[in-house]
Every structure is written in structure tokens, then in C-alpha cells.
Amino acid sequence: MNRLILTFSLLLLSAQSALAAPTVYIPLGSANVVIAVDAATDAITATYTDVYEAHGLVATPDGEYLIAGSFRETPLKPGQPKDTPNSTLFFIHPAHGHVMSTIPVAGSSHHQAITPDGRYVLSTHGMRGYVSVLDLESNTIARTVPTGRAPNYTLITKDGKRAFVSNSGSNNIVEIDLATWKVVRTLESGPAPEHMAFSGDESRIFVTNPRAGKVSVVDVRTGKVVQSYKVGKAVHGLDIGDDGRTLFVSAKKENKLVAIDTQSGDMRTLKLEPQPYHLNTITGTGKVYVSSAKKPLIWVVDQKTLKVVNTIKLPGGEAHQMAVVQE
């Protein structure tokens, strides 16, 4: 009897864990869809169509809506103002299973970030030199904020007061005061910065320098680069692990995923081929999702052992910026 009760309890706990697992929403670029993945089973559970050339993606904090950017833009005609809307943001309602609306925007967008209160979505527009600010209360672009040449990636602090934008063409990171929507400071970044991730306490920013094959560590208080890690050619995606100290970084041209202990500096390497690309740690699961730039798949990697434990076969395209929603 006791053994039966124990078995039932374990099954119940397992079921509760599965129910509590996050959902991961993933844009598939050239496949023109966004998918939903159950992080407990790594199974694709939904597909949202007509999301054209989506690269960046965020979810509202309650998981009710997704906002995706697009690389697709219509060329401007001679004489048209530069701020003429010629691209799109897609507003997706997962419960309804489709794109609910589209928001016109000037210029293709690369990556997205959302404020913790779910009010604003910031999109980087690399060819325009600014971030656009979508107000989700009105579903309109409220403003644009010039940041520098080729803005790539945005981080927003947990308190919602500041945003940091990497400018690949300006070789810097800028800080935006979200109360005034003005750039208030310029930070070092290493050469041609792209993807970024905060340390757990937000005291440091880890930023990729793809051309230099390294990750720079920026002290947020001083704005100075205080350390760097040599990772390999064409570093791309990065994220911090569940333990708050392990940084996972992909190097496309060396076909590897690197796990860096940010306290000791020790590195572990996992070969992944071809071309590991975007990645996300899936908080609470011990997993890292790593996409391939060349094949429609995602490797599921165990954070502790750095071994591939599953592979998600995608319906097409390539996986880009992922949004993780905790159930």
C-alpha cells in the first residue's frame, strides 16, 4: 500500500511538473510561421501562419499576446519620406491561434524587447539607426529613439526604468531612460556588438563581438569593458543559465556551443553541426534550446552535462529570437 501511494505521489509530481513547464514561442524566419513548443516534452504544440520573415519575437508578461518583427520591407519609392511605413509588426493571439492584427512600421526590424509591465515593445531597426516603440495600449508606434549605427539588440532592466541597445556600426552600447525616452549614456562594448544578456543581478552585460570571435563583459555602473572571453569565429547567440553563473554561447563558423563559468572562467565545449545559431536557456527546465542557421532543427542541450538530450525537427526555416512563457 505504501509503495502504491509513493508511486502515485511521484506520478502526480511528474504530472504537475509537466503542467508547469514553460511554453517556448519561436519565429521560423523564411518559413513565415511562429511555433509553440512544450518545454516539458520538446514537442511542437501549435503553429501560427502568415508571420512573414519573422526574426525577433517577444511575449507579453501574461503570455496572452506575441509580437513579432519582420525582415520583410517594401522598397520606398523615389521621393517617399524615410519614415514611410514599409514593414510590419505582427500581433499574435496564441489562444485564438492566429495573427490578430498588424502594425505598420518604417523599416525592417531585427530584435524585440518588451517592458516588464507589458506596455511597450522596443524593436531595433538596423538600417534606420533607431529603435521604434510600440505602445500596446493603442497598437501604434508611439515614437522612435535614435541610438546609433546598426542597432541590433535590446535589453530592458527588471525594474523597467532603463534599456540598453547594442549598436553594431557604432561599436558601442547606449542606455535609454525609459521615463524620458532619451539616450543618457554610452557604454563600451567591444567591436561590432550584437546579442546581449544580463548577469543575474544586472550588474554586467555580456555582449557578443562576432567579428572578433569573443564575448565582452561590460560593467553597467562604469560602462567599461572589464573582461572578455575568446569563444570562436562568428559568435552569435548567448544566454545565462539557471545557476546564474554559466553563460552559453554559440560560435557558428566553428560549429560549437561553449559553456563559460563566469566566476572561474572555465569553458566547456559541445560540437554542434551545422552552425549553431540563436539560443535560449529555458528557465526551470535545465535545458538550452540551440537552433541551426543551416537546418530546420533545434538541439536541446542539458545545461549541467552539456549533452544533447533531444532534437526538435522544425517544419522549415530557421529558429530565431525565442520567447519563453512560464505557465
Residue ranges of predicted features:
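Predominantly soluble domains enriched in secretory-pathway, periplasmic, or organellar proteins
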Residues: 4, 10-327
